[in-house]
Amino acid sequence: MTDCTKEQMVFPFYKQKSLTVNFKGGDLSSDGGLLFVRQLDERWKITEQLAGVLDDRRDQRYINHELLALLRQRIYQVGAGYEDCNDADTLRNDPILKMCCDQSTDASDALASQPTLSRLENTITVRELYRIGELLLEFYFAKHKRAPRKIILDVDSTD
């Protein structure tokens, strides 16, 4: 029988500790795929670019989570299938999500709460949404050598 599985994989983006994944069991997480999303984000700098088009209008005296960390948490949660901000309270201490957001895995160092992420979403202006759209288009065109023959927009307004 052919063994096509690597023994282990290393994810260098997490600077606080060595992060090595193996396939031998032990502590398991249903969100391990986020490690690959984070690795791609590290290469393509998508969340960093998104943070660059948003103005952080929060009072700096009361900030516990940097804008980039909030964006990563929210985007990675959606990428893992947690579409609602209310999932943030359940995921605040998820070790994989914390690593992907460059947060310590210590229990006392939680990710942002649902109200914090909801405030982030509700403070984005129309102008910033437009800039986000432009950025995503630029990113798309940079990754494709030629324009596609057609683009299908699947707009589904149902839940």
Model-predicted regions and their roles:
Residues M1-D159:
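Dynamic "connector" segments at or just before major functional cores
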